[in-house]
Amino acid sequence: GYQDKSIKEITREMFDLADGMTMSAKKDGIVNMGGFIATRRKEWYEGAKGFCVQYEGYLTYGGMNGRDMNALAIGLDENTEFDNLETRIKQVEYLAQKLDEYEIPYQRPAGGHAIFVDASKVLTHVPKEEFPAQTLTVELYLEAGIRGCEIGYILADRDPITHENRFNGLDLLRLAIPRRVYTLS
């Protein structure tokens, strides 16, 4: 059992089991841009490093400035602290409760950093060819100034051979919860 282990210990053990990982650090790394690839396999490293230099920057910084690398290190540390994780989860739960009150459908269970609203069920009058999640994303911003992100048909891109839109899967509006805000104050 893990009930007596710290989040840092659980995280360390989890990553010890992986051959490799990627992370977009914009959310839980508390930086404005960046991320990383980590691997213990030499051949994966050798295969990836050429792309780093070509597209991102030298291997030691990958296109990130020193300030963002320092912020990422702090963010990774802070996000293995129980109090921070608990606060974040409670923020997401709070939004989920509000959506429940208004019977707005979303993916359950609620996540650790975001809520995914089922746009096809909210905008039933918008056909899939008019991209319900993108429509909801735009309208929510115009009406309330709330910035979300479409995770669905547009993100799925078009079929590379037929160039037709791909409409299989879900069409969701992601509402990522900002960090370090006074949600309930």
Model regions: which residues?
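Phosphate/diphosphate-binding loops
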Residues: 23-29, 132-144
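Short, glycine-/Ser/Thr-/acidic-enriched flexible segments
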Residues: 26-29, 41-44, 77-79, 112-113, ...
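Conserved glycine-rich beta-strand-loop-beta hairpin in the small C-terminal domain of fold type I
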Residues: 89-93, 107-119
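Short glycine/threonine-rich loop-to-helix capping motif typified by GTGT followed
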Residues: 116-131, 160-166
